[in-house]
Curated annotation (Swiss-Prot):
This is Small ribosomal subunit protein uS5. It comes from Lactobacillus delbrueckii subsp. bulgaricus (strain ATCC 11842 / DSM 20081 / BCRC 10696 / JCM 1002 / NBRC 13953 / NCIMB 11778 / NCTC 12712 / WDCM 00102 / Lb 14). Transmembrane segments: none annotated. The keyword Isomerase does not apply. GO terms for cellular component: small ribosomal subunit.
Length: 170
């Protein structure tokens, strides 16, 4: 497994950037020898509150990356933000991977490692603290981070939930 965090961001005409997280070489043993394919893991986002990820497999690396970018664009989510940080603390979970995300003061930057940092950067979140708990496999960490971002609620959402719960009690 090779991390490719140093790859350049590519801009598309719809203003969505993509960042390559990992490329894995997959080998299938067949009667005639070994067949090699590549699996790419890509995070896409517009740095304005929208982020997604995708995986792609192909016999050539560029084709795997293209497939991953297309898959990432199809499952983008919207992330609520307060300034340059997240509204509240949240724990994202996927498989055996857990990611704790905490809001941070303006100017403190992204205190996160590896895959979480890439997701936060692509979402446009500039100030956040995170801790990866459990699995450190990039795909599990990204899925747990996306799960945590999906669980975020804005202040208005919480007020609406409280009002609806209050009206049900009356």
């Amino acid at each position: 497994m090779a991390n490719r965090n140093d790859s350049k961001n590519r801009r598309n005409k719809d203003d969505i950037e993509d960042q390559l997280v990992a490329i894995n070489r997959i080998t299938k043993v067949v009667k005639g020898g070994r067949r090699q394919r590549f699996a790419a893991l890509v995070v896409v986002g517009d740095k304005k509150g929208h982020v997604g990820f995708g995986t792609g497999k192909a016999t050539e690396v560029p084709e795997a990356i293209r497939k991953a970018v297309e898959a990432g664009k199809k499952n983008m989510i919207s992330v609520p933000t307060v300034g340059t940080t997240i509204p509240h603390e949240v724990l994202g979970h996927y498989g055996s991977g857990n990611v704790l995300l905490k809001p941070a003061e303006a100017g403190s930057g992204i205190a996160a490692g590896g895959a979480v940092r890439i997701v936060m950067d692509m979402a446009g979140i500039g100030d956040v603290t995170s801790k990866s708990l459990g699995s450190n496999t990039p795909i599990n960490v990204i899925r747990a981070t996306i799960d945590g971002l999906q669980k975020l609620k804005t202040r208005e959402d919480v007020l609406k939930l409280r009002e609806s719960a209050k009206s049900l009690q009356d």
